[in-house]
């Protein structure tokens, strides 16, 4: 396992009410409503953010709007590189909290 995989797995175990799942074939965190709140993608995390959190995450060096396929950006989803792993938990918590409020 890479350091990113180890950290992401630890976060799954630390954050109440999330479970491991899959999104686009990658490890993700599923909230109680069955929706993905965060995903591990090529040793980066991908989180759904809005407003100030979205802008702050995009301001991190190397972060970008997530594109699962080139030219197909996902609105409000940000890909954050492992170099910012100290910030991962805060963004995962914001994302999972917001996603858990969405309807099934």
Task: Describe each region flagged by the PLM.
Residues 1-104:
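Charge-dense, helix-prone N-terminal extensions
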């Amino acid at each position: 396992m890479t350091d990113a995989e180890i950290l992401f797995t630890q976060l799954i175990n630390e954050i109440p009410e999330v479970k491991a799942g899959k999104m686009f074939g990658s490890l993700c965190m599923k909230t109680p409503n069955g929706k993905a709140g965060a995903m591990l993608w090529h040793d980066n995390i991908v989180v759904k953010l809005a407003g100030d959190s979205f802008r702050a995450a995009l301001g991190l060096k190397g972060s970008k709007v997530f594109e699962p396929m080139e030219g197909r950006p996902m609105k409000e989803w940000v890909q954050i590189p492992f170099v910012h792993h100290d910030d991962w938990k805060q963004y995962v918590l914001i994302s999972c909290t917001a996603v858990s409020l969405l309807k099934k």
